[in-house]
Design a protein with these regions (language model features):
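Long C-terminal subdomains/extensions of small-metabolite kinases
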Residues: 1-151
Length: 151
């Protein structure tokens, strides 16, 4: 979310704004702590950020969740741990485009039915590139259900 908020403020720079925002974020890392309920099991976590996906790709071609499948009834959960140093984080960024980031010791990748995030301090939510609402947040997946609205 931090990257997205800054990127919106410098939108006039075009697509390079995400690279600039990412670098700014790396040098101003905000470590987070909170409680996660993963499939209704409670975990205390230290993390930089938590990302929930239902498709393989996000942004401009980032293979963020290589095992994601729209039809499997699962959410893909990516947790970047806050014990990562700045150098390791810089090395990790290019791997987001190949999916190799999920094998990093600093990344936890799981497929789950539900996730609830209750951070120590509430944060803005970035939902599909839009800042919308704040934490805490609970996300569930409903298998093979898609609401259709007619106007």
């Amino acid at each position: 979310t931090d990257i997205g908020i800054l990127a919106e403020k410098i939108r006039w720079l075009g697509t390079v704004r995400y690279t600039i925002s990412s670098l700014f974020y790396i040098f101003n890392i905000k470590k987070r702590y909170g409680t996660l309920f993963i499939n209704n099991k409670k975990f205390k976590e230290n993390y930089l950020f938590v990302l929930i996906a239902n498709t393989k790709y996000t942004g401009k071609g980032m293979l963020i969740a290589p095992d994601a499948n729209l039809n499997d009834g699962l959410l893909d959960l990516i947790i970047v741990k806050n014990n990562i140093n700045k150098f390791a984080l810089i090395k990790l960024l290019p791997k987001l485009f190949t999916g190799e980031h999920i094998s990093s010791q600093y990344v936890e990748y799981k497929q789950v039915k539900s996730i609830e995030i209750i951070p120590e301090k509430n944060e803005c939510l970035n939902i599909d590139g839009e800042i919308y609402g704040t934490t805490p947040v609970k996300v569930n997946i409903s298998n093979k259900k898609l609401p259709i609205y007619f106007y």
